[in-house]
Design a protein with these regions (language model features):
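N-terminal nucleic-acid-engaging modules of covalent nucleotidyltransferase systems
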Residues: 1-176
């Protein structure tokens, strides 16, 4: 098995969905790769940092366990503000460039930048019968009520909602 940052570079090299699924299938048995994908693609996991520096080190080797332990501090907000910034800089200093820029940094910015989504990963895991799934959180978008006049019966007050909230209805005495 390749290192996760090498896998990401391979995934970047081709835009074919089938190619990406093949590469993911070959490497999804790795717990490190699974955990990294989950941290990156799970929309409910946030790190609370906006700027993640690039790495210029040619030497270094940050162990996955160390990264995960420190990432948990960011997720749980035990490190915030300057302490979080300093923690991230310490992680950068322990890593080498490929390792940090192509794997750890991309997890923290929540973007693998290789054309892989949670849907692709979940499809591959399902095909392999793995007990692994990245949660998918999709917002339902609002539709124009004017296109569905039959659904609104009687008199009512209507307020446009553009944020995805569908409807709040108050029913008095069982009648609409």
């Amino acid at each position: 098995m390749s290192e996760p940052w090498e896998i990401i570079k391979i995934l970047e090299s081709d835009n074919s969905r089938l190619f990406k699924e093949k590469i993911i299938a070959e490497n999804l048995q790795s717990k490190q790769f699974q955990n990294g994908l989950k941290m990156c693609l799970d929309p409910l996991v946030t790190f609370g940092v906006k700027q993640i520096p690039l790495c210029e080190n040619k030497k270094g080797d940050l162990k996955w366990e160390d990264f995960q332990k420190n990432a948990d501090k960011l997720i749980n907000r035990t490190k915030t503000g300057h302490a979080a910034r300093d923690l991230i800089q310490d992680l950068v200093d322990q890593s080498h460039q490929d390792q940090w820029d192509n794997w750890y940094r991309r997890i923290l910015i929540k973007d693998l930048r290789c054309g892989v989504s949670e849907k692709t990963v979940n499809n591959v895991a399902k095909k392999l019968d793995l007990d692994f799934k990245v949660p998918v959180f999709k917002c339902m978008l609002a539709h124009d009520g004017a296109k569905h006049p039959k659904k609104i019966k009687g008199s009512c007050f209507v307020e446009y909602k553009y944020d995805g909230v569908r409807v709040i209805a108050i029913v008095k005495n069982g009648s609409t």
